[in-house]
Amino acid sequence: MSKVTGKVAQIIGPVVDVVFDSENAELPKIYDSLEITRKDGSILVLEVQSHIGEQTVRTVSMDSTDGLSRGVDVLATGNPIQMPVGKDVYGRLFNVIGDAIDGLGNLPKAGEDGLPIHRQAPKFEDLSVSTEVLFTGIKVIDLIEPYSKGGKIGLFGGAGVGKTVLIQELINNIAKGHGGLSVFAGVGERTREGNDLLREMLESGIIKYGDDFMHSMEEGGWDLQKVDKEVMKESKATFVFGQMNEPPGARARVALSGLTIAEYFRDGAGEGQGKDVLFFVDNIFRFTQAGSEVSALLGRMPSAVGYQPTLATEMGAMQERITSTKNGSITSVQAVYVPADDLTDPAPATTFAHLDATTVLSRKIAELGIYPAVDPLDSTSRILTADILGDEHYDCAQRVKELLQRYKELQDIIAILGMEELSEEDKLAVSRARRVQRFLSQPFHVAEQFTGLKGVLVDIKDTIKGFNMIMDGELDKYPEAAFNLKGTIEEAIEAGEKMLAEN
């Protein structure tokens, strides 16, 4: 079938109307991609959003429409946007339309070499039902809101409380310990963070560019001629970026582009064997925000707080694809920006419904200098049950929560009347709760250059032992400061002994 061509009729920012005047040809289908070849030879991709009239389609551009004019030829591809898949995507960086942005050349994505970004979620009978805990080495997460393998995890927090650092630490810990493949979708976040992440992954060996390149990088260079393409195939991560400076069309689709690569590895298509994949999204709120911009540009009536009326539908269509099947699993970690620290805002509230575990980052805890600034009372996990975790873990987690809840209730009394007015029992509870609160912090590998402290991974057995010792009163003699930013309880005891000796 010959490809259908049309002409640009109207351009309003990223929204482009295209007229197809041939009588017999079919209009492109919804979500099909159209291509415009610019004067400099570069290709601008449009995605069909709606049919208006008999011969006109309204599309959203995946790149800037600067310099575009009416009357330019548009080619209908007959397919949705395609992403390259296969072993060659290991260690590579792509944009929303599957073009390489790492300077190492494009990969083929036509026919069998690619997959469309719009796909159906797996059928119900293909889903996996087993529950297995995924330990991260981060005490507060493993103890109080444990993550499940193949589950969906949300990191909620306002601006600047540490979502991206926590995601980077999770990539570092899980990707190293888990040895599987990671796919990272950067959705509408800072380009600088994407650059930092790539360097971090190269230094930790999750992405491999070869020894020659690493020597040039250590000397301050970035010589892509030295990249070893064969060694690169041993990499354990793939990146897909659509950052803050991209038009809303790209930001609204880049999460789907990353997900398509993750689905390919989960299903084992072409390789015969499915894999366990980690899928990181930073930031899922920007996906909603871009959808809201596109919706307004397309002239749809806004709903609550100015969001698109299709908010729940769009979120559901994406989240239902992030799932585990009998072939393999996708464990997803999604950072969720919380506008004005309001968890009832429609964007974070819609995301909540899809998650198995939520890690809520709190500004109040960050202000105390406790990092990661996870709020143990607001954070939840579906698998925090004795059946899955065992009695010892479950009982310890519940005791920690009860103690912190008691401390929270007493804070108003302390603020008004002071500590002296509390009973002896409550004074003891407060002093232990403050130690527990500080011991929930730990130094991160990815923050070593800021803290000057070596990052640690803490085994769950050591975590449980440490918190039980604090709550049983075995460590009441040590000052609170001894417990801050420590890994195991032995480190805290050592620091406490030192402080006591100095006094």
Swiss-Prot record:
Assembly and partners are described as: F-type ATPases have 2 components, CF(1) - the catalytic core - and CF(0) - the membrane proton channel. CF(1) has five subunits: alpha(3), beta(3), gamma(1), delta(1), epsilon(1). CF(0) has three main subunits: a(1), b(2) and c(9-12). The alpha and beta chains form an alternating ring which encloses part of the gamma chain. CF(1) is attached to CF(0) by a central stalk formed by the gamma and epsilon chains, while a peripheral stalk is formed by the delta and b chains.
Q: Which GO terms describe its molecular function?
A: ATP binding; ATP hydrolysis activity; proton-transporting ATP synthase activity, rotational mechanism
Entries under InterPro entries matching the protein:
AAA+_ATPase, ATP-synt_VA_C, ATP_synth_F1_bsu, ATPase_a/bsu_AS, ATPase_alpha/beta_chains, ATPase_F1/V1/A1_a/bsu_N, ATPase_F1/V1/A1_a/bsu_N_sf, ATPase_F1/V1/A1_a/bsu_nucl-bd
The family note in this entry says: Belongs to the ATPase alpha/beta chains family.
Q: What is the lineage of its organism?
A: Bacteria, Pseudomonadati, Bacteroidota, Flavobacteriia, Flavobacteriales
Q: Which SMART domains match?
A: AAA
Annotated compartments: Cell membrane
Question: Which keywords does this Swiss-Prot/TrEMBL entry list?
Answer: ATP synthesis, ATP-binding, Cell membrane, CF(1), Hydrogen ion transport, Ion transport, Membrane, Nucleotide-binding, Translocase, Transport
Q: Matching HAMAP family, A to Z?
A: ATP_synth_beta_bact (MF_01347)
Against Gene3D superfamilies, the record matches this protein to:
2.40.10.170, Bovine Mitochondrial F1-atpase, Atp Synthase Beta Chain, Chain D, domain 3, P-loop containing nucleotide triphosphate hydrolases
Catalytic activity field: ATP + H2O + 4 H(+)(in) = ADP + phosphate + 5 H(+)(out)
Official protein name in the record: ATP synthase subunit beta
Membrane topology annotation: Peripheral membrane protein
Q: What is its EC number?
A: 7.1.2.2
Sites binding ATP sit at 157-164
Protein purpose: Produces ATP from ADP in the presence of a proton gradient across the membrane. The catalytic sites are hosted primarily by the beta subunits.
